[in-house]
Amino acid sequence: MPEQLRQWRQKVSLERVKEFRDKYEAAGVLIEIVKVDGIFNMADKEIDYCFALARGLGGRAISTEISHKEEDLKRLGQFADKHQFMVGYHGHATTKPEHWETAFSFAKYNGANVDIGHFVAGNNVSPVPFIKQHHERITHLHLKDRKFHDGPNTPFGEGDTPIREVLRVLRDNQWNIQATNIRFRPVRIG
């Protein structure tokens, strides 16, 4: 599959991307964040294409899972700075604020996609201070409720995640940070 995807990227013109974007926008849908998996393993030309694709779709950031390898964050940060286009590194419960701060130190356009449920579960503190300190680097938030100490996902209001406080901070400061409701439901098979 990776080779098929690589070949597809080499064939799809940015004109086709514009047509795709136009269809979505005509339906009232804006594409703000473009999720790209496997970007750290891509050749330079492919990474350039991903940035052009994201911009062509109308996005304001690329999202990808955070790497704990500094060389990955430096390399992708160089592309982000070259294209003057944010990369929001998505963190999980194992991601500490220092991981994002390290990424920030490597490139102006390295940012954070903070999943506030994962943040609470892994760091056992509110994400609000981190959001306040780094709001200019946060591309978007994933909203979910989890318990401290790597606890499970819960219905909103039953976990330890201060969802209301986070949303109020965004609203009161008028920060342009997209907050996306991430819902988890068990999937029935069969």
Annotate the PLM regions.
Residues Q4-R6, V34-V36, R60-I62, D150-N153:
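A short, structure-level motif marking secondary-structure boundaries and short turns
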Residues Q10-K11, N41, S67, G157:
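Residue-level marker of alpha-helix boundaries and capping positions
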Residues M1-E19:
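Glycine-rich, proline-tolerant flexible connector loops at the mouths of alpha/beta enzymes
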